[in-house]
């Protein structure tokens, strides 16, 4: 407690200090505004001289150090003064005075927003169930964890939602306009549930990985532009594409597209699978089907694969129940480990369906699916069934060690004996195509169908180890020039962008393809293995006259050195393969070693895969799961109008042959070391010669040698090394690819076909 004396003693000092401090502060303010004034400056302050300081009373003189101490603080305060000022209309004083009514209204809108959403959500419910009504995600979601899409809604001051264009187990896809980029996009809205969010995050990671390896976007994978969180939903923004291949089939009344167009789709798909098989990616799509293959433009044949929501990388498989049932591979049905080969099986099923118009294996359940596969391909090999955990779900083992089909419990379904429903007859190889609808058409000769059938049989090999790989599939004669120019869409051997990369250190140095995800997903009510995969039809379909479908991609040069083919897990393959070339030969196609009986001579009448000419009849309407496919009536008046062969321009680059004569080639394998291609020239042949010598087509000699050893790369992948002899390559010109000129393009037979298109804008 202060005494009175102490208080009175302090007062005179306080009275005298106040004016002196204010005086010096004023002087300091003037000094601070002058240039080069600083606490540590060597220059004297002009405001107060030494004589002035000495003339001041003692109490004023002791304030000079205080002056030097305060000056920097004032300078800092001046520097912090704002240079720009806010709009007076937003000032708190204005909001709480003249705009007070507006302020209260805004507070009420924010406060009652949640209550208003709850009220709107429950308006359509029965009044008796009001107590049971629940609100999800503050009224933004429905009871299925899906975002409630409102047309015209604007997100983040950027995306204007136009309409819902797809729905699936993952969530929804909406069409939206991006105000920043000024383009239409497809936004995939993931369900607001942790399991779906986790899987979508894997999808984003895979898509970004593919984007990184494909800056030019030329490998037929959809492009992921960006992703963000909005109201607890992960949203993936994709490029806008056109309708899917199932829509295309539906618009042909399920009669199928031409073999030429099927070839274009097949080559792009094989290129995409080759890209996914690069060691840096090793991605398994796990759900290839017509609904997940979209046209880039309704008047072009360019396609892209979408929906990587079920995808995984090799060695990171987390699901056992994958793939849509019609396209599910035998190893998945049998519960065996799977790899990238399951996508090749799906592709084989898709290509047949695209040409015939109907699924090749349309099982109503897994047992029915396996039985329909066996009808066409026979009983799977014993060495596969012996290792299959679920083999006894479909088959029973006989005392002699062989396997046979189990009898169905209901006894209602009757199947043809194993292997008697021949692919030869399904495709109509010698009867004018499926249902005879392609008889006499250009590009649908017996030779063309034989090549197509052989490629499909290699894709549908029961054994994933010997199932054809994308690298070899792209070299198949189905994609090559024949003596009959009308049988192909290009004048020469077709290659894909993935085949153009040069070999570097035993791997492909690639830019690769991006984007996957599910943009513009299907709206069809197609039967699926998973009932949650049903897609709703969205209204507003419109008809578009498709006159020509051309693929527009890059036209890089083809190098003479092929990349190393990318093997699949467990594949027995040579560690080094030398391709022998001769000036008068044309390389046909490579096959994996130890092909099974499916790949043998098809012209041998004693061979058990010789296809007799039995016609496959359709009895009425065939129920396919949850949908019924329309019956196809073989009317000759409709055959020309249903040709959908979209013309490809320069997209599928081809290597020009130096010789158009009927030629052959051989592929030989050798071990590593200096022995070169002489190592196994005398080994017994593991596959017979395949002869396509019909109707002017070339003869193809396949010579396959077994391999005594295997080098494994990453994740069980065999390591391949390919080299071409330095002699003149018979399938290319000097260093370049002779590109097909526009004048040589065949007339598109798509003119006048009316195609019903999904309401998805084409990019």
UniProtKB/Swiss-Prot annotation:
Q: Where is the signal peptide?
A: none
Listed Gene3D superfamilies = Phosphorylase Kinase, domain 1, Transferase(Phosphotransferase) domain 1
Please note every region of biased composition (Low complexity).
502-525, 654-672
**Where is it localised?**
Nucleus speckle
- Phosphothreonine PTM sites in chain numbering: 402
Q: Which BP terms in the Gene Ontology apply to this protein?
A: circadian rhythm; negative regulation of DNA damage response, signal transduction by p53 class mediator; negative regulation of heterochromatin formation; negative regulation of microtubule polymerization; negative regulation of mRNA splicing, via spliceosome; peptidyl-serine phosphorylation; peptidyl-tyrosine phosphorylation; positive regulation of RNA splicing
The record ties this protein, via Pfam families, to: Pkinase
Its Gene Ontology cellular component terms are: axon; centrosome; cytoplasm; cytoskeleton; cytosol; dendrite; nuclear speck; nucleus
PTM per UniProt? Autophosphorylated on numerous tyrosine residues. Can also autophosphorylate on serine and threonine residues (in vitro).
Enzyme Commission number(s) of this protein: 2.7.11.23, 2.7.12.1
Query: What broad class of enzyme is this?
Result: transferase
Compositional bias (Basic residues): 598-620
Q: Where Phosphotyrosine occurs, residue numbers?
A: 111, 140, 145, 159, 177, 219, 319, 321, 449
Ligand binding (ATP)? 165-173, 188, 238-241
Q: How is its activity regulated?
A: Inhibited by RANBP9.
* InterPro entries in the record: Kinase-like_dom_sf, PKc_DYR1A/1B, Prot_kinase_dom, Protein_kinase_ATP_BS, Ser/Thr_kinase_AS, Ser_Thr_dual-spec_kinase
Q: Which residues carry this modification: Phosphoserine?
A: 14, 310, 529, 538, 748, 758
Q: Where is the composition biased (Polar residues)?
A: 46-61, 485-501, 634-645
Q: Where is this motif: Bipartite nuclear localization signal?
A: 117-134
Q: What is the active site of this protein? A: 287 (proton acceptor)
Q: How does it assemble?
A: Interacts with RANBP9. Interacts with RAD54L2/ARIP4. Interacts with WDR68. Interacts with CRY2. Interacts with SIRT1.
PANTHER family in the cross-refs: DUAL SPECIFICITY PROTEIN KINASE, DUAL SPECIFICITY TYROSINE-PHOSPHORYLATION-REGULATED KINASE 1A
Known function: Dual-specificity kinase which possesses both serine/threonine and tyrosine kinase activities. Plays an important role in double-strand breaks (DSBs) repair following DNA damage. Mechanistically, phosphorylates RNF169 and increases its ability to block accumulation of TP53BP1 at the DSB sites thereby promoting homologous recombination repair (HRR).
This chain belongs to which protein, by name? Answer: Dual specificity tyrosine-phosphorylation-regulated kinase 1A
Origin species, per record, is Mus musculus (Mouse)
Gene giving rise to this polypeptide: Dyrk1a
């Amino acid at each position: 407690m202060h005494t009175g004396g102490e208080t009175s003693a302090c007062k005179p000092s306080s009275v005298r200090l106040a004016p002196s401090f204010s005086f010096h502060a004023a002087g300091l303010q003037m000094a601070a505004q002058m240039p080069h004034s600083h606490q540590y400056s060597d220059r004297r302050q002009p405001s107060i001289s030494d004589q002035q300081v000495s003339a001041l009373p003692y109490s004023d003189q002791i304030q000079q150090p205080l002056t030097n101490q305060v000056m920097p603080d004032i300078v800092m305060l001046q520097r912090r003064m704002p240079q720009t000022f806010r709009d007076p209309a937003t000032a708190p004083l204005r909001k709480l005075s003249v705009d007070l009514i507006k302020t209260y209204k805004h507070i009420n809108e924010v406060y009652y927003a949640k209550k208003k959403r709850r009220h709107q959500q429950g308006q359509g419910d029965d009044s008796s169930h009001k107590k049971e009504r629940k609100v999800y995600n503050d009224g933004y979601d429905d009871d299925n964890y899906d975002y409630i899409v409102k047309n015209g809604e604007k997100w983040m001051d950027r995306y204007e939602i136009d309409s819902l264009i797809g729905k699936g187990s993952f969530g929804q896809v909406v069409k939206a306009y991006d105000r920043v980029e000024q383009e239409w996009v497809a936004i995939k809205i993931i369900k607001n549930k942790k399991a779906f969010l986790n899987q979508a995050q894997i999808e984003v990671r895979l898509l970004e990985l593919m984007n990184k390896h494909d800056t030019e976007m030329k490998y037929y994978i959809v492009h992921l532009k960006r992703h963000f969180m909005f109201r607890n939903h992960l949203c993936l923004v994709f490029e806008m594409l056109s309708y899917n291949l199932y829509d295309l089939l539906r618009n042909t009344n399920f009669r199928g597209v031409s073999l030429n167009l099927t070839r274009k789709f097949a080559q792009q798909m094989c290129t995409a699978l080759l890209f996914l098989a690069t060691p840096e990616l090793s991605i398994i799509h796990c759900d290839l089907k017509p609904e997940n293959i979209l046209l880039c433009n309704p008047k072009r044949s360019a396609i892209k694969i979408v929906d990587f929501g079920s995808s995984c990388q090799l060695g990171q498989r987390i699901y056992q129940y994958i793939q849509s049932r019609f396209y599910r591979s035998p190893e998945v049905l049998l519960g065996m480990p799977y790899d990238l080969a399951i996508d090749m099986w799906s592709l084989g099923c898709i290509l047949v369906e695209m040409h015939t118009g109907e699924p090749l294996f349309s099982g109503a359940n897994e047992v029915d699916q396996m039985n329909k596969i066996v009808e066409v391909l026979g009983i799977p090999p014993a060495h596969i069934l012996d290792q299959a955990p679920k083999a006894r779900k479909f088959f029973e083992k006989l005392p002699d060690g062989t396997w046979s089909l189990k009898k169905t419990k209901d006894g209602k379904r009757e199947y043809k004996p194993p292997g008697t429903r021949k692919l030869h007859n399904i495709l109509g190889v010698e009867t004018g195509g499926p249902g005879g609808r392609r008889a006499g058409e250009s590009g649908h000769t017996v030779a063309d169908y034989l090549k197509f059938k052989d490629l499909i049989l290699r894709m549908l090999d029961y054994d994933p180890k010997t199932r054809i790989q994308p690298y070899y599939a792209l070299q198949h004669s189905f994609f090559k020039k024949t003596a009959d120019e009308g049988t192909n869409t290009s004048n020469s051997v077709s290659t894909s962008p993935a085949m153009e990369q040069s070999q570097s250190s035993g791997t492909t140095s690639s830019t690769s393809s991006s984007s996957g995800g599910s943009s513009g997903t299907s709206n069809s009510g197609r039967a699926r293995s998973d009932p949650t995969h049903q897609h709703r039809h969205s209204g507003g379909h419109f008809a578009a006259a498709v006159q020509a479908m051309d693929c527009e991609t890059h036209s890089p040069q083809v190098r003479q050195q092929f990349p190393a083919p990318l093997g699949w897990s467990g594949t027995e393959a040579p560690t080094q393969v030398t391709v022998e070339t001769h000036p008068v030969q044309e390389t046909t196609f490579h096959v994996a070693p130890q092909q099974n009986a499916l790949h043998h001579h098809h012209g041998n009448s004693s061979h058990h895969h010789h296809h007799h000419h039995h016609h496959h009849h359709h009895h009425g309407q065939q129920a396919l799961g949850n949908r019924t496919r329309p019956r196809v009536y073989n009317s000759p008046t409709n055959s020309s109008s249903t040709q959908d062969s979209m013309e490809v321009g320069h997209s599928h680059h081809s290597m020009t042959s130096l010789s158009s004569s009927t030629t052959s080639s051989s592929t030989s394998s050798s071990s590593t070391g200096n022995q070169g291609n002489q190592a196994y020239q005398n080994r017994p042949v593991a596959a017979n010669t395949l002869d396509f010598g019909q109707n002017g087509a070339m003869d193809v000699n396949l010579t396959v040698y077994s391999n005594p050893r295997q080098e494994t790369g990453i994740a069980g992948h065999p390591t391949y090394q390919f080299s071409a002899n330095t002699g003149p390559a018979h399938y290319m010109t000097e260093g370049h690819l002779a590109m097909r000129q526009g004048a040589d393009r065949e007339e598109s037979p798509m003119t006048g076909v009316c195609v019903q298109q999904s309401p998805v804008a084409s990019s």
